[in-house]
Amino acid sequence: MSHQAKYATAVGLLVLLNGCANMADSGSNVTASDPKKATRTGFLSNYAKMEKAPGGDGALCWRQPGLDLKAYNQVMISRMVVTLKDEQIKGVDPADLKALTDYFYKSLVTALKPQMEIVDKPGAGVVVLRIALTDLVPTSVGRSAMGTLIPYGFVAEAGSGVAAGGPAGSTPYLGQTGMEIQFLDGATEAILAECIDTQIGRKYAADVESGASGATSTWISGYMNSFQSWSYARNAFDKWSKQIAKRFAELRGISPQAK
C-alpha cells in the first residue's frame, strides 16, 4: 500500500472514530494526576501539610485531625474562582469558561445530591466548598490529529508523555486542568480540609484493571477526547466530583448513593 493510500485510510479512520466520539463513556481514567504541575496560587491556607490523598490518583490533601463529617448533611458549592495565568486567559473564550464552570457545578451536584442536600446558604451542618480553577489549557486538536495521521506517528507520541515526565498515555499538547478546593464549616468558617490537583489528558489510556472490554472502552474514550478542545477538562471535573462524593461518604460512614 502506498503512503498516499495509508494516509487516506488513516484520515478515513479518524473521521469514522470522531463520529463515534459521543458514544464513548467519559471515564475517570482518561485523565491522570500530575502533582508536579499543580499550581499553588495562595487560595489555600497551608500547602506544606498536604499529602497524597487516599483513594485519589495523585491529588494532595490535608484534613483537620479527627474530622467527623457525620455532623454534616448539607453542602453549599460557592461561586467558583478562576485564577489562570495570563497566557492561559488569552487562550480561553469567556463563553467556554462559563460553560466549563457551569459544567463543574452540575457535576458536583450530580455526585453529591444522592447523599447530601444541596443548599445555597451556609449554616450549621453545612459543608461549604470553595473552588479555584488554577489551570485550564485546551487540547491542541490540530496537533492531536497530525500525530494520528502521520504514518507510525502514534507510536512515537504514545510514549512522549512519560518521556517528558508526565503521566503514561499523555502527550505534550493534551489538555490540562487544575484546581484548588477548600472545605469549610458553614457555621464557623473553620477549615475542615483542603486539596490541590492538576489533571492531564491521556490520549492513550487503558484501564487494565477493568478487564479487556473496560480497557478497550477507556482507550477509545481517551483517544476520542484528544480531538475535542475541552473534553479532558470535563472528564477532570467529573473525576473530582466522584472522588469528593466518595470521600464524603467514607468519612460520614454511609453509601455515596444514600442520604
What are these regions (language model features)?
Residues A21-T31, L44-R63, T171-K259:
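C-terminal/domain-edge helix-coil "capping" segments
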